[in-house]
Amino acid sequence: MRRTVRKTEIWGFYYMRRRIQVEAEKPQFCVTTGITFAQADAWFGNTVQDLKLDLIYPRDNTRKYPCVVWICGGAWIQMDRSAHLAYLSVLAQQGFVVASVEYRTSNEAKFPAPLQDVKAGIRYLRAHADRFNIDPDRIGVMGESAGGYLTCMAALATDPVYDVGENLEYSSAVQAACPWYPPTDFRGFPYSDPEQCAASPESLLLGKNVMRHPEEALACCPVSFVTKAAPPFLIIHGEDDHTVPFGQ
């Protein structure tokens, strides 16, 4: 049985036999997790724990990049520094180094411990700026909710009492802050009575009932630290927020 083979079929066989070279696209950013930046007392001074950060950075290491320090939320009761790496990678694609830092929660240590941890992370990044291709003069801080509070405090609180631990020869100052729905005045939460407030995240952070100790609570709030010397702020907050009131 004879069959006529058309020219188009011959060319089809020819192209099917050709080897097509496809180069894999190089990633635009890299991720390194679990970098220990400090050690701190935990469980009220009875143990020691490593504080770690995750780093997302552009693949091109031929120049220095501005750095965004990310602080996750969790009502100071829990936190997961790696929870948001997927969308934080967008910043690395735009030319930022992103460092997501760990801090002690309120069941491990009370204020100012979490702020001291964040500032220790900032100092560590400055101390290792060359290693991580960071421009030490362009470090900003960003965080959500409880992390937004720590973002405000990291940008505003300059008293040396908040800088403890290693790398003290480096500054923990930041050049910009972007808090997302941050608690800024603990007295402004709508608790009906002191007994209800005793178990609030703010009271657990301070180790004191913020309704019974309003002056001490205010002394730990970002509104008490605002000055003309503060770096630029971009505050992001939804008007219908029922967890952190918009008035904060």
Tell me what each language-model feature is.
Residues 1-248:
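Alpha/beta-hydrolase superfamily serine-hydrolase fold, recognizing
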